[in-house]
Amino acid sequence: NRNKIENEYFESNDEFNSKCIPILYKEVNYNFIYERIKKYDPDVMIVFGSSIIKEPLLSLSKKNKFLNLHLGLSPYYKGNATNFWPFINNELEFLGSTILHIDSGIDTGDIITHVRPKIEKNDNVHTIGCKIIQESAKKMGMILNLIKENKEINRIPQWNTKNEKIYKLKDFNQGILEDYLNKIENGIVQKFLLEEEEKF
């Protein structure tokens, strides 16, 4: 189901259009990666779906030019699968992504912008995820244009919230998946849309 949905949203998007350095997820903080990127001296670096970036790689950050696309709304949802957990917690208002300046924490950098999807009645975690990625890519393009034009980009420090949640891969299990499927079957998305409609 997931592959089918991703193919609908991202047909013919299994290759990069530009030259890139292939880096395996677990290798991101290895010294040979640091040396290679240092030699390459990129104008801008964007992290998406990586583990935490550590020193010395973090030190290559140029002012406002090391960005992280986090698929979750920081500071509320951080860590892993952060557009899955709002379904479990009945908090669909926290679906989205955050484009932020990278730092050494888990999705804790200063915020550039949030991206929110248009939620529709037949959506699920996969369709929502694809919509968020599409909208985030458009927004990232706009931010890169600002950087290219030497314009300032937002730098909003994350605020304290008692609702902050940090999820790890180990939090995901069979019971949680069954809970998600039950919520979809019982109309969590439709109920959310109805509640949103009633606010206006």
Q: Where are the language model's segments positioned?
A:
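One-carbon transfer enzymes
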Residues: 1-200
